[in-house]
Curated annotation (Swiss-Prot):
Protein species of origin: Methylobacterium radiotolerans (strain ATCC 27329 / DSM 1819 / JCM 2831 / NBRC 15690 / NCIMB 10815 / 0-1)
Chain sites annotated for binding Mg(2+): 50, 89, 121
Official protein name in the record: 3-methyl-2-oxobutanoate hydroxymethyltransferase
Gene giving rise to this polypeptide: panB
Catalytic activity: 3-methyl-2-oxobutanoate + (6R)-5,10-methylene-5,6,7,8-tetrahydrofolate + H2O = 2-dehydropantoate + (6S)-5,6,7,8-tetrahydrofolate
Residue positions of the active site: 188 (proton acceptor)
Any one biological process term the GO annotation gives: pantothenate biosynthetic process
Note accompanying the cofactor annotation: Binds 1 Mg(2+) ion per subunit.
Length: 272
């Protein structure tokens, strides 16, 4: 008698298992059902990032992004995927005021979207909030280093970890967030020696996910549009694995030329 194998969506605990097994963790951002569906078979988790404010809406930073925007796009990503864990960014102003505020908004995200985890930026000062959420059933991914929501206080998008004080701070941030119960931590814009120290620390049991933090991390994440070559400008740490911007421009130009010349729609595209 044949046995039916029941597939299921990955969970936060599976990310930790990949770290324990030494398997690299693959992640990308997605904001739409169709793009999420394309990347789903290849990713361990998909991040519905607050970067959608800049990528989708042309905002200058992630600061104006609202909880409602995050929920709407996360719902789309869930509908378009079957396999990957879906993680949703908590936007600026949705978790900083108190642990209670963080739980109310995080639980709303999970209930209204069906996502499997939330991500929040911040270091050791948010460890109590992380523990509060985890103890109440909310899987949390941390995010330290270059934290875009703090761009106004950081003085811009600056590489982190240069200097002994910065190194100590980042190590303490990672240890505190991990020990509070985060299942993973995004390390963004961190110099390689510091990223290595974090990833190899016995006190950091959370999976480390790099974005501009070298190959020493347990996994990697990129903004999908950057990786595909759709963005006009990309950071140093991005490798463009495609050049879709050029292909799209060529396709749109060909379409416009065909319409102007009266060649589209042709008989094949016309109802008789």
């Amino acid at each position: 008698m044949s046995q039916v194998v029941q597939s299921r969506r990955l969970r936060a605990i599976d990310i930790g298992k990949r770290k324990a097994e030494g398997r690299k963790i693959i992640a990308l951002t997605a904001y739409h059902a169709h793009t999420a569906g394309i990347v789903d078979p290849y990713c361990d988790f998909i991040l519905v990032g607050d970067s959608l404010g800049m990528v989708m809406h042309g905002m200058e930073s992630t600061i104006p992004v609202t909880l409602e925007m995050m929920i709407l796009q996360a719902q789309a990503v869930i509908r378009g995927t079957e396999k990957a864990l879906v993680v949703v960014d908590m936007p600026f102003g949705s978790y900083e005021a108190s642990r209670e505020q963080a739980f109310l908004n995080a639980s709303r995200v999970l209930k209204e979207t069906g996502a499997g985890a939330i991500k929040m930026e911040g270091g050791a000062h948010f460890a109590e909030t992380v523990a509060f959420l985890v103890q109440r059933g909310v899987p949390v991914m941390g995010h330290i280093g270059l934290t875009p929501q703090a761009v106004n206080t950081m003085g811009g998008f600056k590489v982190q970890g240069r200097g002994p004080d910065d190194e100590r701070r980042l190590l303490e941030d990672a240890r505190a967030i991990s020990e509070a119960g985060a299942f993973a931590i995004v390390l963004e814009g961190i110099v390689e020696p510091v990223a290595r120290a974090i990833a190899s620390s016995p006190r950091v049991t959370a999976a480390t996910i790099g974005i501009g933090a070298s190959a020493v991390c347990d996994g990697q994440i990129l903004v999908l549009e950057d990786m595909l070559g759709l963005s006009e400008r990309t950071p140093k740490f991005v490798r463009q694995f495609g050049s879709l911007r050029t292909h799209i421009e060529d396709a749109v130009k060909a379409y416009a030329d065909e319409v102007r010349a009266g060649r589209f729609p042709a008989d094949d595209h016309t109802y008789g």
